[in-house]
UniProtKB/Swiss-Prot annotation:
It is found in: Nucleus; Cytoplasm; Membrane; Cell membrane. It comes from Xenopus laevis (African clawed frog). Functions as an integral cofactor in cell pH regulation by controlling plasma membrane-type Na(+)/H(+) exchange activity. Promotes the induction of hematopoietic stem cell differentiation toward megakaryocytic lineage. Essential for the coupling of ERK cascade activation with the expression of ETS family genes in megakaryocytic differentiation. Also involved in granulocytic differentiation in a ERK-dependent manner. Inhibits the phosphatase activity of calcineurin. Keywords: Calcium, Cell membrane, Cell projection, Cytoplasm, Differentiation, Lipoprotein, Membrane, Metal-binding, Myristate, Nucleus, Protein kinase inhibitor. It is a lipid-anchor. Pfam families: EF-hand_6. One of its GO terms (cellular component) is cytoplasm. This is Calcineurin B homologous protein 3. Belongs to the calcineurin regulatory subunit family. CHP subfamily. Binds calcium via its EF-hands. Calcium-binding mediates a conformational change. Can also bind magnesium.
Length: 214
């Protein structure tokens, strides 16, 4: 995709689909070309080579998220082999900076979208539920990347997070219900009060240098 005047209609369509401005789309198109080596699609290998991801404790989950059909709005499960620029924009829209002019409804939609994306990262088997063990494992992986937290402490914090999640979920259940895992509604309750709208970003794609959405 070129971003010349002849592609203005295509750019407007991308603005409508992703919420990015034309300026932001141009910025991301340059980043896409840099990552893909000027190829029309990005594959896993392109993301594997990003230096900022090498030491990230959830590197594989981040890369998987770019090819997850759920995040690409292509189906309830499975992965694609490669993504084009429009699909790249769809994924990047989950990390879109908030605008100061967004109303409460749009902020709520943005928050839900971000949490759904995060839920999909935890829900590795695509069954619309997160087991407590899956949740504990990801929390531990996230903490393991912090040089100030020892492995045993990371495991202890992750265990605590798992127990807290269980208490929130089980507390909502009827007496005869069997606990099967964290649903998305449960996940929303667990993350209630956490400012995911501004904290969820992706540094290696230089999102912080992109102007806020209008």
């Amino acid at each position: 995709m070129g971003l010349s005047h002849s592609h203005s209609v295509e750019t407007r369509e991308l603005v409508e689909k992703t919420g990015f401005s034309a300026e932001q789309i141009e910025h991301l198109h340059k980043r896409f070309k840099s990552l893909s080596g000027d190829e029309p699609t990005i594959r896993r290998g392109h993301l594997n080579d990003i230096s900022d991801l090498v030491l990230n404790p959830i590197r594989s989950k981040i890369i998987d998220a770019f090819f997850d059909k759920r995040n690409l709005r292509k189906g309830p499960s499975g992965y694609v082999e490669e993504i084009n620029f429009e699909e790249f924009l769809i994924i990047m829209s989950y990390f879109r900076p908030l605008s100061q002019h967004m109303d409460e409804e749009n902020i709520s939609v943005c928050r839900t979208d971000k949490l759904r994306f995060l839920f999909n990262m935890y829900d590795s088997d695509n069954d619309n539920k997160i087991t407590l063990e899956e949740y504990r494992k990801v929390v531990e992986e996230l903490l393991s990347g912090n040089p100030n937290i020892e492995k045993e402490m990371a495991r202890s914090i992750a265990d605590g997070a798992m127990l807290e999640a269980a208490s929130i979920c089980v507390g909502q259940m009827e007496p005869d219900q069997v606990y099967e895992g964290i649903t998305f509604d449960d996940f929303l309750k667990i993350w209630e009060g956490i400012d995911i709208e501004t904290k969820m970003h992706i540094r290696f794609l230089n999102m912080e240098s992109i102007p806020s959405c209008r």
